[in-house]
């Protein structure tokens, strides 16, 4: 900052210095300072480069403005040494004017300091980051609302302007996906109505005051229906105001509809006019008026035509008839009106025929389009079915080949294991037979020795008894073969059961035991009890495996923590209830021992104690007594425990059956 102030002071003193030197050297002469020297230009370039760093603005309170050289600057013009005067240059127009070179010592200022960092920039940066983060979060919420229905409900209900933003994006997406819909809507442009030429009504048409005073009141066809008799037309006028009112209405209607009449009534030259029907006269009238009554013209009725254009044309024509009927010279227009009626009737019939033809052609095109679409759809379905059938055949062949490979590999493994087990059992049986033969020989020798000694003592008195013993030994030796076969099968069954139990107990992860179970089933093929026990095991259990006891306990601890979090939730819980239950579950104290009660914490404590004791049956019963969210969360764990219990029960039944066989042999 000090260097910057010093450079500003030097730049301020430069013009004053030159001005003071010029005044002292050329007193009373005209001073013309022109910055044409190379030294002056270099000085100004260095000064400008030294001050290229933007100084702090006047709004910064910590930075003061540089002081003027006349008041606060420490550098005075008098303290600057004067350079020697340069010799006069030839050809100079003003002998007294000169340009002094700047001082080179002060032209090299030190490097400018770094600009100070104000606190406002950091605040603006934080505010900008906050706005960007909020905008990104809002945009992300709008995008995720289009993907998730649950988040859509939350976002549109609790976020301001969330519903409008989501609806706007959905509308934009709809317009991008179906652009032809908006184009068809924009194509519906209202066609301007051709008003046609103006129609001039004669000045003598309409009602007059003489008709209201002398003649009977004319019938208002727009209010009385489509057809009226002459008896209503001959009724006397009761009030002059009624005629004046009718005259004003007729004039207003004629002025409003005169342009529509000229535009909507088509001119057909090929139609011949037909004479109008003469109206029936009422012969029972009490008297004849002095002035003939106004002729009433029958209005046109088009009930069969539903076209809006024809109905509007008929309405305009009926208004014209009403205007003519209200005039005293209505009889003059009876013929043209009748001709116009016939032409309008023909026009309506022609429009109906054209509409019917257009509808029939449109229906024919629709039927043709439907037939073509059905044909193309059937062809497409046929192609899809062919491709699907081909793919299914290829997939079936691949599946059969893979299944055969897998079955072959598993069969080889099973045969290898069975062969090894059979060899081990046979070797064990041979060893036992050798031991039993040795024992029998030893007993036989001891018996023979005893008999020989007894014979020696009894002098052949017990020879018959010795013969009986030998026969008994032969019988026992012959019966031992059956015992050996039964023992062999029992031992093989026990080995297979031990293999299943070892597989279940020594596996760190659930492993399938299909091969071991198949070996047990093959060894006990004639035993119905073993077959029923194997059938009671779920196929998913021996195909995927079952967890061990340690895995069940570890998983129960994780499930128990989640059940404690949801223990305080009602049936129809929301976000607030979930949050409250999560917070309160952290505060709840765990029970110890065997607590009594049906609350979630007591049930979890008892279940954990039963699991530590190895009593999975009671643990499953305790967890099955849970209700609501707790039971829903522990559903998968209960299914695993049930599979473990089913497998253990089946293995216990098979082991019991094997022991029973041994007892039967004994």
Swiss-Prot record:
> Out of the domains of life, which is the source?
Eukaryota
Membrane topology is:
Single-pass membrane protein
Polar residues bias locations: 33-54
- Low complexity bias spans: 64-78
Q: Where is this region: Disordered?
A: 25-122, 251-287
Biased region (Pro residues) positions are: 108-118
> Function, please?
Component of the MICOS complex, a large protein complex of the mitochondrial inner membrane that plays crucial roles in the maintenance of crista junctions, inner membrane architecture, and formation of contact sites to the outer membrane. Plays a role in keeping cristae membranes connected to the inner boundary membrane. Also promotes protein import via the mitochondrial intermembrane space assembly (MIA) pathway.
Q: Specify the protein name.
A: MICOS complex subunit MIC60
């Amino acid at each position: 900052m000090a260097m910057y102030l010093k450079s500003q002071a030097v730049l301020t003193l430069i013009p004053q210095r030159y001005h003071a030197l010029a005044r002292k050297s050329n007193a009373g002469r005209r001073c013309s300072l022109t910055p044409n020297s190379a030294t002056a230009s270099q000085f100004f370039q260095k000064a400008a480069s030294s001050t290229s760093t933007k100084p702090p603005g006047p709004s910064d309170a910590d930075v003061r403005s540089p002081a003027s050289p006349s008041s606060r600057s420490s550098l005075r013009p008098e303290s600057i040494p004067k350079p020697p005067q340069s010799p006069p240059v030839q050809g100079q127009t003003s002998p007294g004017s000169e340009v002094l070179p700047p001082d080179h010592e002060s032209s090299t200022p030190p490097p400018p300091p770094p600009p100070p960092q104000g606190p406002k920039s950091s605040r603006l940066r934080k505010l900008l980051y906050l706005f960007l983060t909020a905008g990104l979060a809002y945009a992300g919420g709008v995008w995720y609302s289009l993907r998730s229905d649950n988040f859509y409900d939350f976002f549109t209900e609790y976020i301001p302007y969330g519903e409008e933003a989501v609806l706007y994006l959905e509308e934009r997406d709809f317009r991008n996906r179906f652009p032809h819909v908006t184009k068809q809507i924009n194509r519906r442009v209202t066609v301007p109505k051709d008003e046609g030429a103006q129609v001039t009504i004669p000045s003598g048409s309409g009602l007059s005051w003489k008709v209201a005073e002398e003649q009977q009141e004319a019938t208002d066809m727009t209010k009385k229906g489509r057809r009226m008799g002459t008896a209503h037309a001959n009724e006397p006028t009761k009030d002059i105001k009624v005629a004046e009112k009718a005259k004003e209405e007729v004039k207003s209607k004629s002025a409003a509809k005169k342009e529509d009449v000229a535009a909507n009534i088509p001119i057909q030259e090929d139609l011949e006019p037909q004479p109008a029907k003469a109206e029936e006269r009422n012969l029972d009238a009490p008297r004849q008026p002095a002035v003939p009554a106004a002729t009433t013209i029958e209005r046109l009725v088009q009930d069969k035509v539903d076209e809006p254009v024809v109905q509007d044309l008929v309405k305009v024509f009926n208004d014209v008839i009403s205007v003519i009927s209200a005039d005293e010279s209505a009889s003059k227009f009876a013929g043209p009106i009748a001709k116009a009626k016939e032409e309008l009737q023909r026009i309506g019939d022609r429009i109906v025929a054209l509409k019917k033809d257009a509808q029939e052609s449109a229906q024919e095109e629709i039927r043709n389009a439907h037939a073509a679409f059905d044909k193309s759809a059937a062809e497409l379905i046929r192609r899809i079915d062919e491709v699907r059938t081909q793919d299914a055949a290829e997939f079936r062949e691949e599946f059969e080949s893979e299944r055969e490979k897998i079955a072959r590999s598993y069969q080889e493994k099973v045969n290898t294991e069975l062969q090894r087990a059979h060899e081990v059992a046979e070797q064990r049986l041979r060893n036992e037979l050798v031991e039993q033969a040795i024992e029998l020989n030893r007993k036989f020798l001891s018996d023979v020795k005893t008999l020989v000694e007894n014979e020696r003592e009894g002098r052949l008195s017990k020879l018959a008894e010795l013969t009986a013993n030998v026969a008994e030994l032969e019988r026992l030796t012959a019966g031992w073969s059956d015992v050996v076969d039964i023992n062999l099968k029992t031992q093989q069954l026990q080995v297979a059961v031990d293999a299943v139990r070892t597989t279940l107990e020594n596996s760190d992860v659930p492993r399938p035991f299909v091969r071991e179970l198949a070996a047990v089933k093959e060894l006990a093929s004639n035993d119905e009890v073993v077959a029923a026990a194997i059938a009671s095991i779920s196929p998913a259990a021996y195909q995927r495996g079952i967890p061990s006891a340690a895995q069940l306990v570890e998983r129960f601890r994780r499930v128990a923590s989640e059940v404690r979090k949801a223990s305080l939730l009602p049936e129809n819980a929301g976000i607030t209830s979930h949050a409250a239950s999560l917070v309160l579950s952290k505060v709840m104290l765990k029970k110890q021992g065997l607590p009594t009660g049906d609350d979630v914490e007591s049930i979890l404590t008892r279940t954990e104690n039963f699991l530590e004791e190895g009593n999975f049956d009671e643990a499953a019963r305790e967890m099955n007594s849970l209700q609501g969210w707790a039971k829903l969360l522990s559903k998968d764990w209960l299914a695993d425990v049930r599979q473990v219990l089913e497998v253990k029960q089946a293995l216990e039944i098979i082991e019991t059956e094997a022991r029973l066989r041994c007892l039967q042999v004994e």
